[in-house]
Amino acid sequence: MAAGFGRCCRVLRSISRFHWRSQHTKANRQREPGLGFSFEFTEQQKEFQATARKFAREEIIPVAAEYDKTGEYPVPLIRRAWELGLMNTHIPENCGGLGLGTFDACLISEELAYGCTGVQTAIEGNSLGQMPIIIAGNDQQKKKYLGRMTEEPLMCAYCVTEPGAGSDVAGIKTKAEKKGDEYIINGQKMWITNGGKANWYFLLARSDPDPKAPANKAFTGFIVEADTPGIQIGRKELNMGQRCSDTRGIVFEDVKVPKENVLIGDGAGFKVAMGAFDKTRPVVAAGAVGLAQRALDEATKYALERKTFGKLLVEHQAISFMLAEMAMKVELARMSYQRAAWEVDSGRRNTYYASIAKAFAGDIANQLATDAVQILGGNGFNTEYPVEKLMRDAKIYQIYEGTSQIQRLIVAREHIDKYKN
């Protein structure tokens, strides 16, 4: 098996270097008019999906429970994912990356999340941290900070949330004061994924001291090296689920950042920070679908083996109907993230679809994890079976990268604006 997997890796890396890149340039991703809608994946997409699936089932699943128990950061798995080309997929080709689209990243993310969403979140945390630079960085910034991530398995982090500012991003208190050719950063961030493992951070700070300044002018986005003096990394938080993911608070005390590390310019940070979500929320939704699919598979497997009242569980209509509902929900959630990803890869603004996908898939992941525990009964409540972990892991999909309630606000706003305009 090891030899076979090794050959698969070499083949995939070959595809990554040649065929995949040639097939997925921006020019080639443009669809010819009149071709209609298609559910068919390209051969390269199938290769990436199959490799991620094999990796999740053969390397992640066997150790997921132990990582959940210890809370240890899954360094060997992250290194392996990097070797397979399953990380940093958004990084442009001119920076050494594959330059893949959001749809491609979603296919990989779903498979990784099927194995363990803690591992998937650590990897997706990288994508979120990178995205502001991908969409707003200049050539020098991209080559310096994105390029290094293709040379070795480094991590980065999206450093925005604060103790008193989660959904209310405009309420952040971290300040950036310009002094000569550098900025002095002071403030505190919280719930930062990869916070203790990152090589660098995307940081959002208030650069306009006027409290009445509009959000689209009051904040500036920075790239901050993690080893800069004045950065104090807090303890690893013990969370309800996704425990192998690294989540921390970070204090910035008189941290000096050169002006060369500003994205676009003063006051552009809020737009940059929010713009990243159109590309990352579909990928988060795909992770939620991966968890939901795992819950459905575990529940179905159990129902085909367990007997009660002289019958298999699947022979009881109550259980078969539950499985049918679960199957319908996971299929619809998958379609939602694929639509959102397809829209942004086609060059269109996808805020509406990205929020639908994020909210719907997050809710479905929680519903299916709960139903899986119910079908397994007492066994589902026990750590000997994987569904209790799925139930704990699922909750964060309704919280991070925009709560389900915030997504509904966005969907409502976009929907109403269509009719007004």
UniProtKB/Swiss-Prot annotation:
Q: Changing residue 280 to E: reported impact?
A: Narrower substrate specificity. Changed substrate specificity towards longer acyl chains. Loss of acyl-CoA dehydrogenase activity
In the record, the note on similarity to other proteins reads:
Belongs to the acyl-CoA dehydrogenase family.
Task: Please tell me, according to the UniProt entry, what happens when changing residue 98 to W.
Answer: Strongly reduced rate of electron transfer to ETF
Write down the InterPro entries for this protein, in alphabetical order: Acyl-CoA_dehydrogenase, Acyl-CoA_DH_CS, Acyl-CoA_Oxase/DH_mid-dom, Acyl-CoA_Oxase/DH_mid-dom_sf, AcylCo_DH-like_C, AcylCo_DH/oxidase_C, AcylCoA_DH/ox_N, AcylCoA_DH/ox_N_sf
The encoding gene is ACADM
- Annotated keywords: Acetylation, Disease variant, FAD, Fatty acid metabolism, Flavoprotein, Lipid metabolism, Mitochondrion, Oxidoreductase, Phosphoprotein, Transit peptide
Which Gene Ontology BP terms does the record give? cardiac muscle cell differentiation; carnitine biosynthetic process; carnitine metabolic process, CoA-linked; fatty acid beta-oxidation; fatty acid beta-oxidation using acyl-CoA dehydrogenase; glycogen biosynthetic process; liver development; medium-chain fatty acid catabolic process
Full protein name? Medium-chain specific acyl-CoA dehydrogenase, mitochondrial
Where does this protein hold octanoyl-CoA? 167, 278, 281, 401
Q: Which residues carry this modification: N6-acetyllysine?
A: 69, 212, 217, 259, 271, 279, 301
Residue(s) carrying Phosphothreonine: 351
- What result is annotated for mutating residue 191 to A? Loss of electron transfer to ETF
Q: Which disease is it linked to?
A: Acyl-CoA dehydrogenase medium-chain deficiency: An inborn error of mitochondrial fatty acid beta-oxidation which causes fasting hypoglycemia, hepatic dysfunction and encephalopathy, often resulting in death in infancy.
Transit peptide, start-end:
1-25
Q: What would changing residue 108 to M do, according to UniProt? A: Strongly reduced rate of electron transfer to ETF
Look up keyword Iron-sulfur and say if it applies. no
Q: What does this protein do?
A: Medium-chain specific acyl-CoA dehydrogenase is one of the acyl-CoA dehydrogenases that catalyze the first step of mitochondrial fatty acid beta-oxidation, an aerobic process breaking down fatty acids into acetyl-CoA and allowing the production of energy from fats.
Pathway of action: Lipid metabolism; mitochondrial fatty acid beta-oxidation
Q: What is its EC number?
A: 1.3.8.7
In this chain, where does the modification N6-succinyllysine occur? 69, 179, 212, 217, 259, 271
CDD domains, alphabetized:
MCAD (cd01157)
Q: How is it modified after translation?
A: Acetylated. Could occur at proximity of the cofactor-binding sites and reduce the catalytic activity. Could be deacetylated by SIRT3.
